């Protein structure tokens, strides 16, 4: 599982300034006074997804054209204007499912929706993801579904936890997701999107995904 940048030839969708978000009251630092009751912290987007249906998860994902930033394979930050495609690829190189979001959506927000979509189509034993998906919520939800999560640990200023030898060997197959993204861009038109709007861009990319699936199945049969 991985995401790839999709550059678009359209303007960034402006946010509605009419929506005024009320300021959150800040709690005073330190222990609360006796009798004071502090409100419970709001759940994170990932925690909120636990109690949602697949349709609710997908509805909350931003699908408008936006600006995105990520690190490339060399460790340098790159920025682009457009979208982000999140394909879920099997170990044989065939995409099981895909979700298109705005470029500003973090990869981890799409992990649980992809897990549920792919579970309806294939029986998987493992789910392999890079450090962008490192989250206790994602790990627990995958384990509840009866699969093994192999997610590269993000130390976040702590000690990095390495894979066990057998897990590291299995994790090597995640490179198939990167090859799938590269083939979509180099061979099946994902690098040259001429249409505008989420629906048309998704249609353009899905035609490439269908062609990639057919080509990959042919390679597996030969």
What are these regions (language model features)?
Residues 3, 77, 97, 102, ...:
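Generic secondary-structure boundary/loop-capping signal
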